[in-house]
Amino acid sequence: MHSQTIEMATRLWEYMAAGRGHAPCEAIVVCCSYDLRVADYACELFRRGIAPQLIITGNTGNWTKHLWSIPEAEVFRERAIAHGVDPAAIRLETEATNFGENISCVRRLVPELRRAVFLTKPNSVLRVQLTLPVQWPEMQGMVDAPAIRFPDEVSNVVGILGVIDEMVGDVDRILRYPQRGYQTAHNLPAEIIAAWEYLKSQRFTNHLVR
């Protein structure tokens, strides 16, 4: 792969993953995906006592509808139990198919929740940060992700090309979704827009908003 493509994609990855963190709270909300390392990180935080419960949310999405025959949340739950989490400390939400639904469905499940850390993939941190204020204004939410390096440690489920496609699509959503009421507005720096335009010119367009 061309070195400039990797450079531009790394720029997107690092920007989208910035600002993540966690603190003691009421629940760890796990936004499921194709990357089970998010489940592993949730188990690590749970063992450290960050929160007394895991709320795992996700049905299937673009990347997992052909990967597993059961909802993502059930796959992640099995992973958490295998890592020693007490099943009684896990709640499931199996309807959500995107970040907005992850948050709104968990809100319906536990409306009393006020402080939580939402876990996702590193390249999805910004998307979740921008979606939270729209879907759950009263939530004191933090967003965190496992420490995964691009490009060397990307998921082999989708590979480097798939992750670049995903990030290009995420930037597209950051630009378009505020007008649709899905996310809060966010001013992307010129260098991020330039990286996005370059990657689109290299035909990383499979995940753009349709």
Predicted regions and their residues:
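A conserved mid-domain beta-alpha-beta active-site/ligand-binding segment of alpha/beta enzyme cores
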Residues: 154-210
